[in-house]
Amino acid sequence: MKLFDDRGDAGRQLAQRLAQLSGKAVVVLGLPRGGVPVAFEVAKSLQAPLDVLVVRKLGVPFQPELAFGAIGEDGVRVLNDDVVRGTHLDAAAMDAVERKQLIELQRRAERFRRGRDRIPLTGRIAVIVDDGIATGATAKAACQVARAHGADKVVLAVPIGPDDIVARFAGYADEVVCLATPALFFAVGQGYRNFTQTSDDEVVAFLDRAHRDFAEAGAIDAAADPPLRDEEVQVVAGPVPVAGHLTVPEKPRGIVVFAHGSGSSRHSIRNRYVAEVLTGAGFATLLFDLLTPEEERNRANVFDIELLASRLIDVTGWLATQPDTASLPVGYFGASTGAGAALVAAADPRVNVRAVVSRGGRPDLAGDSLGSVVAPTLLIVGGRDQVVLELNQRAQAVIPGKCQLTVVPGATHLFEEPGTLEQVAKLACDWFIDHLCGPGPSG
């Protein structure tokens, strides 16, 4: 049975189910190409701004229609572990596919936006729209991109999908709206009378119309309150240069330096989400790679807490030489092993760190340095991360300065569950407002 005349009809029907979002701080994000005509109708009905999230499926080389994952803007990568195992793909084969698709992703992003800035998502509801869901790899990547860009809430809205769509997107979308979930679902096109391909030119035309006709009604100006500084930077940390991203808003109240966990980088989706929230609250942020690519190849370096802490100390010293950050009080936000490094660095007399926040951290890796931490410290742990919770409880008993342990109910180690990372960001923001902006710790 055909449920929709075409993508426009599907979008109008979908908009009716999303009517409760009217008047809220919404950005509608279409997945090109087929999702954009649907998203246009949703944005038009909600009088919300329309943008695209460009993602590319990663197809198995000998069976391209079977996706083993997807990539999105800003380095987001999602893998389907079952497909990878079942097809016996190795890293070299996957990397070759990803390199090719990355070129196409960049081309499309430039073509579709035509020089316009990405619409900011910080503090907004991101409504991600496609013409339907098949494997879901593309939409999952899109959800992660939206969250990385600071969306307060991620809603996935599609006209048609499998009957287990809600379960599939647990941990990716906060809410899933799907008009039809046929018991015998085999393809997105089965719900449409007209399912002809959408061209690049049509995508551009829809975005142009939305920008002209109703973007202003959404009251979101991409150029409003631009950061004073928002750029990739090269930092000399000891004997090596490391890559970072520095964001400084107007009249910053302090700066938070992020220390990522093992196997991560300055592109960490979760850290970038927290950083966007902090920037929105008036804090400058620096996300940087604790190790060079060459150093990362030696796995021992990843867990060399003294080395990682020395990088934090060096970077903190570098910030003191930058005109935009020299006078700002400094805080650390550490995740996993990065939290251990942050606590070691905070205990070092060469730096004046005013506050520390740990997300799913390993403070036990800080060893004897815990006994010298006087900066107010917030330890955030998931309620279902039992082993790490016990490690943090022991660390709290050792840290002599103010130390608070907060448990996020229902969260596992990575805070992937809907709403849990948002709680982390709010807790961190409140902690830095209370402790980074006031007088420093005594001792």
UniProtKB/Swiss-Prot annotation:
- What InterPro entries does its record include? AB_hydrolase_fold, Dienelactn_hydro, Hydrolase/PRTase-associated, PRibTrfase_dom, PRTase-like
- Specify the domain of life of the species encoding this protein: Bacteria
Under the heading Gene3D superfamilies, the entry gives: 3.40.50.2020, alpha/beta hydrolase, PRTase-like
Gene Ontology, cellular component aspect? cytosol; peptidoglycan-based cell wall
Describe what upregulates or represses it. Answer: A member of the dormancy regulon. Induced in response to reduced oxygen tension (hypoxia), low levels of nitric oxide (NO) and carbon monoxide (CO). It is hoped that this regulon will give insight into the latent, or dormant phase of infection.
Extract the SUPFAM superfamilies matched here. alpha/beta-Hydrolases, PRTase-like
Q: Which residues form a coiled coil?
A: none
Keyword presence, Transferase: yes
Q: What name does the UniProt record give this protein? A: Putative phosphoribosyl transferase Rv0571c
